[in-house]
Curated annotation (Swiss-Prot):
GO terms for cellular component: host cell endosome membrane; host cell plasma membrane; membrane; viral envelope; virion membrane. This is Envelope glycoprotein H. Residues 825-838 are intravirion. Residues 1-18 form the signal peptide.
């Protein structure tokens, strides 16, 4: 009966909503697919074989109250004529999934029932005065026969029939938050409104955009009309079936999904319907409507009392938010708190940038590294902020009639970046299963914009030399998210990373925001092909090299400095005037193959570089560990390793070694070194000497073969040469580790200049990335699997002697000397014959 009930609900809801003149009639696709099926089903009559619905017998209540009116005189003879319409009634066909084998029931419902009037009330006489045109409502619940005492049971949804979507409404009825809108601050006390176009500012068509507009993106305005989707009628169905369908003016949609989660946000004029579902948690739903609107809950058919409104906080000056979910007060308190926070986001501001900034900060929050695996509360908060940013962006763009080019590109880029972080870092999604789509642009305008941006990307790479513009070109390719865009910028991105690495080896500190931003988008476009399927040989080679160089750029000093920079930036950001944009603080460690950044030695290094503050040491240590763990989770993609470093995940005998890699070094196109804390059963294995036995280090050279062997590391000194010649070091990797088991650096020897620098050995007083003051051991890893110990680059511990100890030692020497002199004098006096001459 359930499918039939839905059939009834759709028909009646369509009839009720049909009173709004802006509704667009559409043909039921089932009807088109079912043409000709009437020949398969029939009923025997005196005149032939026809399909005819059943009709209630008016003499048999209660169904008889829904019988056809007498004036229609419907019989088996008149039913085939399809003269079923009667002005005072709505007819409804109730059937099941077996239709038309199941002929169904043809019911008639007086329109007075739909109007909520007594059955004996008469309709008002038609007026001759044309009604005043009223603007259609932004949000209109479609309640159907909710208030009809006879037929409402027929329209109950599957909620309360097979499950209860909101088992504990009181748990989801909570007071308004501290930062939500008030009468004096209708957009929230911490809201920083988005910029408005100046009076008379020109609206540029997307087809005329050029590099000059990119230079001045913050003052380039695009007209909303024709660029964004025009609002259109749409019926929003709550997936939880907890409330009746809602008629809205839709403006777009945001969808994020993967193998472990799905998020869908439907945007409308003064409306947002957000659904968050995960494999590891019950689904949650948030609905935002105008302040004066109420969404009624679908109640239990057996309950005589009318159902109340959906749960949620009290309404505000602009919106009312309803929160749905199966969480109860006995469930996880953090999950319930996260859902309540998500319910407050829509009333906390109107600027999309504030929500994206908060989402980035949420990703690096103190508990980000507290546990492994999916974390529903964090995922709900991240996706809630992400969806609300889209809600704010669309509303502001339609309200202003224009959108700034920098805001358009920024929203599309940062929302895509955050979607990946939320999916991989909070939901536990496989990296190659993540998909993301923001459908807020008009389809035709989107194609025009993408074509223009593709042209601008090619023009930037061909004519411009500025690092900032090249970073913008990679950002545009990231926004376009198309194979052609990625292929167009990949050679330039690979060259940029090589150039930055050369500057790093020369002693330059890569800490400016534009460098971070360029590294972020360059790394993203080089890693992207593995998401679209099996990468080509060229794509794999570029990605392997970018991963190797990112690992080389991530020395222990860089990792500690990154942690300190992130802590400082997060503490400084107020998400109002000072925003936190993650690409501006991007670290190569997050794009590397180093998965050891959350180990204790790195945490101590980061704490040692922390500046003085009033933050308690325990809190600072927790924040530091959280940031380090987040960097590791951000970088560690199992799918990425399978795509670009397949030898590290190669299976032998049907099983792969259950060893967690700490560092991967893809040294050739088909071989890698891997650092672990336990030996591997295959490859060429080396045990690193001089390391704490509690945290041993093993270095293994891996290929696609399954043979295993062990070797000893040979100690050597490189021969210094007077002339420039190839020493055979290009392609090798310089690795330094400490007795505590910390790998300080894995530096690629990529040029002849670099190999000459190593051959010259460390120079006292000349700082170099190959030298260190920390007691450590230096190795050289060759592409053929050979490893040698570079004695010249070892740093030995120097004994520290206090000045007091030196003074005491000198005094002791003087006293001992005086004592010996006295003894000799006594001996000479007492034994004179020792000195007699013969």
């Amino acid at each position: 009966m359930g499918n039939g009930l839905w059939f009834v609900g759709v028909i009646i809801l369509g009839a009720a909503w049909g009173q709004v003149h802006d509704w667009t009639e559409q043909t039921d696709p089932w009807f088109l697919d079912g043409l000709g099926m009437d020949r398969m089903y029939w009923r025997d009559t005196n005149t032939g074989r026809l399909w005819l619905p059943n009709t209630p017998d008016p003499q048999k209540p209660p169904r008889g109250f829904l019988a056809p009116p007498d004036e229609l005189n419907l019989t088996t003879a008149s039913l085939p004529l399809l003269r079923w319409y009667e002005e005072r009634f709505c007819f409804v066909l109730v059937t099941t999934a077996e239709f038309p084998r199941d002929p169904g029931q043809l019911l008639y419902i007086p329109k007075t029932y739909l109007l909520g009037r007594p059955p004996n009330a008469s309709l008002p006489a038609p007026t001759t005065v044309e009604p005043t045109a009223q603007p259609p409502p932004a949000v209109a619940p479609l309640k159907g026969l909710l208030h009809n005492p006879t037929a409402s049971v027929l329209l109950r949804s599957r909620a309360w029939v097979t499950f209860s979507a909101v088992p504990d409404p009181e748990a989801l009825t909570f007071p308004r938050g501290d930062n939500v809108a008030t009468a004096s601050h209708p957009s929230g006390p911490r809201d920083t409104p988005p910029p408005r176009p100046p009076v008379g500012a020109r609206r540029h068509p997307t087809t005329e955009l050029d590099i000059t507009h990119l230079h001045n993106a913050s003052t380039t305005w695009l007209a909303t009309r024709g660029l964004l989707r025009s609002p259109g009628r749409y019926v929003y169905f709550s997936p939880s079936a907890s409330t009746w369908p809602v008629g809205i003016w839709t403006t777009g949609e945001l969808v994020l999904g993967c193998d472990a989660a799905l998020v869908r946000a439907r945007y409308g004029r003064e409306f947002m319907g957000l659904v968050i579902s995960m494999h590891d948690s019950p689904p949650a739903e948030v609905m935002v409507v105008p302040a004066g609107q109420t969404l009624d809950r679908v109640g239990d058919p057996a309950d005589e009392n009318p159902p109340g409104a959906l749960p949620g906080p009290p309404g505000g000056p602009r919106y009312r938010v309803f929160v749905l979910g199966s969480l109860t007060r006995a469930d996880n308190g953090s999950a319930l708190d996260a859902l309540r926070r998500v319910g407050g986001y829509p009333e906390e501001g109107t600027n999309y940038a504030q929500f994206l900034s908060r989402a980035y900060a949420e990703f690096f929050s103190g508990d980000a590294g507290a546990e492994q695996g999916p974390r529903p509360p964090l995922f709900w908060r991240l996706t809630g902020l992400l969806a609300t940013s889209g809600f704010a962006f669309v509303n502001a763009a339609h309200a202003n009639g224009a959108v700034c080019l920098s805001d358009l590109l920024g929203f599309l880029a940062h929302s895509r970046a955050l979607a990946g972080l939320a999916a991989r870092g909070a939901a536990g999604c496989a990296a190659d299963s993540v998909f993301f789509n923001v459908s807020v642009l008009d389809p035709t305008a989107r194609l025009q914009l993408e074509a223009r941006l593709q042209h601008l990307v090619a023009e930037i790479l061909e004519r411009e030399q500025s690092l900032a513009l090249h970073a913008l070109g990679y950002q545009l390719a990231f926004v376009l998210d198309s194979p052609s865009a990625y292929d167009a910028v990949a050679p330039s991105a690979a060259h940029l990373i090589d150039a930055l690495y050369a500057e790093f080896l020369g002693g330059r500190v890569l800490t400016t925001p534009v460098v971070h931003r360029a590294l972020f988008y360059a790394s993203a476009v080089l890693r992207q092909p593995f998401l679209a399927g099996v990468p080509s040989a060229v794509q794999r080679e570029r990605a392997r090299r970018s991963l190797l160089i990112a690992s080389a750029l991530c020395t222990s000093d860089v990792a500690a400095a990154t942690n300190a920079d992130l802590r400082t930036a997060l503490a400084r950001a107020d998400h109002q005037k000072t925003l936190f944009w993650l690409p501006d603080h991007f670290s190569p460690c997050a794009a590397s193959l180093r998965f050891d950044l959350d180990e204790s030695v790195f945490i101590l290094d980061a704490l040692a570089q922390a500046t003085r503050s009033e933050t308690p040491v325990e809190v600072l240590a927790q924040q530091t560990h959280g940031l380090a763990s987040t960097l590791t989770r951000w970088a560690h993609y199992n799918a990425l390793i399978r795509a670009f470093v397949p030898e590290a995940s190669h299976r032998c005998g049907g099983q792969s070694a259950n060893v967690e890699p700490r560092i991967l070094v893809p040294i050739t196109h088909n071989a890698s070194y891997v650092v672990t804390h336990s030996p591997l059963p295959r490859g060429i294995g080396y045990k690193l000497t001089g390391v704490d036995v509690r945290r041993p280090l093993f270095l293994t050279y891996l290929t696609a073969t399954c043979e295993g062997s062990t070797r000893d590391i040979e100690s050597k000194r490189l021969v210094r040469t007077q002339n420039q010649r190839d020493l055979g070091l290009v392609g090798a990797v310089f690795m330094r580790y400490t007795p505590a088991g910390e790998v300080m650096s894995v530096l690629l020897v990529d040029t002849d200049n670099t190999q000459q620098q190593i051959a010259a050995g460390p120079t006292e007083g000349a700082p170099s990335v190959f030298s260190s003051d920390v007691p450590s051991t230096a190795l050289l890893l060759f592409p053929n699997g050979t490893v040698i110990h570079l004695l010249a680059f070892d740093t030995q511990p120097v004994a520290a002697i206090a000045p007091g100890f030196l003074a005491a030692s000198a005094l002791g020497v003087v006293m001992i000397t005086a004592a010996l002199a006295g003894i000799l004098k006594v001996l000479r006096t007492s034994v004179p014959f020792f000195w007699r001459r013969e």
